């Protein structure tokens, strides 16, 4: 599910009105975060948005597909991401329905063993 960095940057610009937008590379694609909530994946010149009730109502005629074989179905946005106001509203609505991320536990340091 490779995608170019330029396409990812374009999608980030399109979503900027939704809140604090960031990305993280994973699974050969980019995960799109809005206010620290994972709302979409960017890959293969498409955007896969996490399904929510408000998102479904906003989109209307939804196209769904697997992010990867065997995954849950996601909303596939193939062209409407070019409409900045529409796309940022979809991302904002999606993030609004998702729970706050759980705080990450600090990583435990390596144990040191003393040899006698």
At which residue positions do the language-model features occur?
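Charge-dense, helix-prone N-terminal extensions
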Residues: 1-116
């Amino acid at each position: 599910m490779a995608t170019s960095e330029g396409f990812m940057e374009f999608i980030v610009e399109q979503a900027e009105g939704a809140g604090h937008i960031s990305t993280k590379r994973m699974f050969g694609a980019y995960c799109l975060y809005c206010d620290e909530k994972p709302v979409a994946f960017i890959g293969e010149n498409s955007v896969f948005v996490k399904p929510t009730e408000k998102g479904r109502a906003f989109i209307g005629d939804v196209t769904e597909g697997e992010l990867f074989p065997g995954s849950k179905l996601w909303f596939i946005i193939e062209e409407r991401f070019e409409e900045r106001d529409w796309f940022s509203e979809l991302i904002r609505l999606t993030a609004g329905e998702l729970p706050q991320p759980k705080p990450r536990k600090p990583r435990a340091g390596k144990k040191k063993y003393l040899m006698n």
